[in-house]
């Protein structure tokens, strides 16, 4: 029997990815079915459903699921889930699809069939529905009223833009996943299925694992957070987003090299595991933090490191709103229905010259002038402009990799700073 935290949902790992003869037969069948082109976001969602990362989901959400998740963080069956996982279709495409149809979900970028789907429901998403979803999922302490939110959200919030630009209908139903796309080949050993990360943790004898979410290269604060986690847990799972990012973000392969260099040179051997997952960012701030904890539970992690401005977007969210939201979510009764992965809440961290080391607001009594505030956004901005980094911002091995990347770019990358990145 496993010592690890059970997957979310009480059904074990729900994996929709076909293999062997069944996979080959379904691929042939997909070529004969009506084809629906899907977005990069839907592709990532399908892969996560395929490998069990989104357990207990086995398909795209019904309207009851969508509404329950938006309003109450609950699927229709009462299981906790923080963010809608839906498949949109244009009015023209939806008109050709009826409830009961089987369709093939096609990735136009790779020209590959990603899944087949049995359509169990087709529901309209009016502009009012999209506004409802945006206000429920994306509003935060930085814009506490709808009026304040919509003043800037349509232009400045990528998650809102994504939802408002979706098709006029959503399609729901179970899926059979046919591919993991480019991830196994491009990121061997980094891209992992939940069953694989669980096997690694079991082999090491770990029970309590903290997950570290990354979409920026690791700087000293990231390193410090991971080492705090290692002090109180058996190990740390450094888990990077390797799906689509915002323009100006550093590519996954460069970030992987940075993590490798840092772990090799500054971590005790066998206390950290690096992994990657195939989702796109949803830019949902605190709710995205909950999603990170939910699927990390499926990967075998019992704790989720939540620091300052986790999954933040500009100034839409409070600095620690992604921590406090864990205290407000429902805890439904029934096996597997509640979220079991708990937050490891850590205050704002920085390098302090007077402390002569890394510290946090909880441990350092010194003035702002004595501190080097660290953020991934600021790191990218300084390097993209060819500037010198302050001492103690990043490890030399990591900075060398990043400088080489930026020096090789043919076009300058503009990086904008917001309050979270500047310390304001």
From Swiss-Prot:
Stored InterPro entries: ATP-Sase_PUA-like_dom, PUA-like_sf, Rossmann-like_a/b/a_fold, SO4_adenylyltransferase_pro, Sulfurylase_cat_dom, Sulphate_adenylyltransferase
Stored Gene3D superfamilies: HUPs (3.40.50.620), Sulfate adenylyltransferase (3.10.400.10)
UniProt keyword terms in alphabetical order: ATP-binding, Nucleotide-binding, Nucleotidyltransferase, Transferase
Ion transport is among the record's keywords: no
Pathway of action: Sulfur metabolism; hydrogen sulfide biosynthesis; sulfite from sulfate: step 1/3
Keyword Transmembrane helix set for record: no
EC numbers on record: 2.7.7.4
GO-annotated molecular function: ATP binding; sulfate adenylyltransferase (ATP) activity
Biological process according to GO: hydrogen sulfide biosynthetic process; sulfate assimilation
Reactions it catalyzes: sulfate + ATP + H(+) = adenosine 5'-phosphosulfate + diphosphate
Domain of life: Bacteria
HAMAP family: Sulf_adenylyltr
Family stated for the protein in its record: Belongs to the sulfate adenylyltransferase family.
Classification via NCBIfam families: PRK04149.1 (NF003166), sopT (TIGR00339)
Name of the protein in question: Sulfate adenylyltransferase
